[in-house]
Amino acid sequence: MFVLSGYEYLLGFLIICSLVPALALSASKLLRPTGNSLERRTTYESGMEPIGGAWIQFNIRYYMFALVFVVFDVETVFLYPWAVAFHRLGLLAFIEALIFIAILVVALVYAWRKGALEWS
């Protein structure tokens, strides 16, 4: 029996996963409308005429909230597999997860005390 006999499905899946996006991108390039008029190059503003430029400055507080959100969102992504396999992992994994959560709580308290979560 051939050694890689169990991997044909994986190889087929990888080929399909490579071909589908390539075909979709090729089809959209072939079917797109051609023309380079000024009307096509302007931004679409829900049927209204665009007013002003697109370069506006955002308050830095938005970025701070976004960074804090990303940190705790990644925490959820790391804790979800642990929560699914909680009963099989044992006490050591529970202690490691508690240490991980404690580090994130310390980071949250630090951000709170530094004023990163204050809007004023």
From Swiss-Prot:
Tell me the Gene Ontology biological-process terms attached to this UniProt entry: photosynthesis, light reaction
Transmembrane stretches, by residue range? 1-21, 64-84, 89-109
Q: Which reaction does it catalyse?
A: a plastoquinone + NADH + (n+1) H(+)(in) = a plastoquinol + NAD(+) + n H(+)(out); a plastoquinone + NADPH + (n+1) H(+)(in) = a plastoquinol + NADP(+) + n H(+)(out)
Membrane topology per record: Multi-pass membrane protein
> Could you name the domain of life of the organism this protein comes from?
Bacteria
Keyword annotations = Membrane, NAD, NADP, Plastoquinone, Quinone, Thylakoid, Translocase, Transmembrane, Transmembrane helix, Transport
* GO CC entries: NADH dehydrogenase complex; plasma membrane-derived thylakoid membrane
Q: What is its EC number?
A: 7.1.1.-
Any GO MF annotation of the entry:
quinone binding
Asked whether the UniProt record includes Transit peptide among its keywords, one would answer no
What is known about what this protein does?
NDH-1 shuttles electrons from an unknown electron donor, via FMN and iron-sulfur (Fe-S) centers, to quinones in the respiratory and/or the photosynthetic chain. The immediate electron acceptor for the enzyme in this species is believed to be plastoquinone. Couples the redox reaction to proton translocation, and thus conserves the redox energy in a proton gradient. Cyanobacterial NDH-1 also plays a role in inorganic carbon-concentration.
Spell out the protein name for this chain: NAD(P)H-quinone oxidoreductase subunit 3
Q: Species name for this entry?
A: Nostoc sp. (strain PCC 7120 / SAG 25.82 / UTEX 2576)
